[in-house]
Amino acid sequence: MMLVAAIPLAVAGCGGGDAGESATTVRVERPPFNADRAFQDLERQVAFGPRIPGSAGHAEQLEWLETELRSLAPTVFLQPFEHVTVDGNELALTNVIARFGPADGSRLLLLTHWDTRPKADQSSDEADRELPVTGANDGASGTAVLMELARMFNEQPPPGGVEFLFSDGEDYGPSTTDMFLGARHYIAGVGSENPPAYGILLDMVGDADPSFPVEAYSMEGAGQVVQRIWGIAADLGYRRFFPMDQTSRVLDDHVRFIEAGIPVANIIDFDYGPGHGFWHTPGDVVENTSAQTLFMVGDVVAEVVYRNR
């Protein structure tokens, strides 16, 4: 993801999708979100090493994702693809997709990226800028939350169709030409032939000092989805952590979906560390993440799924 610019937001009068108050509300009792297990998944991913396309850690993570999801979801399939970077590097990439319930056009898409940044290009120390990013928050956190949600849905099926997309190649970079690759490939394939109704993107959702203000592109292109998510967060007592206030434009996977006419809102904490100093730096490590933050985000998304379909 990349920061674009800061702009003020108005809460009222926002468009973007039909996932708001007009949706049928069906309340289904649900199991609790297991934060300890989710955090163990975050630690497991970090233990694989950097999950850069072509690396051993990337291959191990892919195997783990597929194996774990096949034990949980009725339908799991891989979406392999290739990409040649602006520098001429050939990347072998794979999206992992899992489905619960009907795969029709009313389904909700939950997505995150599972790859990590090849270089810590935002480090203040020039000597560190060639190092790979560990990706405890930027890569592992969203994946950990979705994996635990998959376990919940296996135990108690959601009241409607839900699709998981673990996208690859989101963070390769450094230019946007070589980013958001998995989202683009999904949209050109599954998302074109059988698009979901709307979606929720999780990115950088493990910060130990969390705050999830509304991201600007999300409000503009998926305003009703935003209203639902942030409203439920307030209902659950998380209003302080999900403020409806000014935010920035963040280029991320959700923008590609919005451009394709699919309203996707981004839950993202883009103020990671003092002075945003942990993003794309060696500071993106397990010690700067929190199981409690994973719980809060997982609790909100689970409630969206089980309450509002």
Predicted regions and their residues:
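C-terminal motif of bacterial Sec signal peptides marking the signal peptidase cleavage site
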Residues: 10-13
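Solvent-exposed loop/turn segments at secondary-structure junctions
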Residues: 52-53, 82-85, 103-104, 114-118, ...
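Second-shell loop/turn segments in exported
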Residues: 26-32, 46-57, 83-87, 129-140, ...
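Extracytoplasmic/secreted proteins, especially bacterial periplasmic and envelope-associated proteins
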Residues: 37-47, 60, 64-71, 141-148, ...
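Acidic/histidine-rich catalytic neighborhood of metal-dependent amide-processing enzymes
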Residues: 130-224, 228, 232, 249
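A non-catalytic alpha/beta surface segment that caps or lines the substrate-entry region
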Residues: 16-18, 28-31, 44-103
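Active-site-adjacent substrate-binding region
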Residues: 198, 207-309
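Catalytic-core environment of secreted peptidases
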Residues: 30, 35-48, 72, 94-155, ...
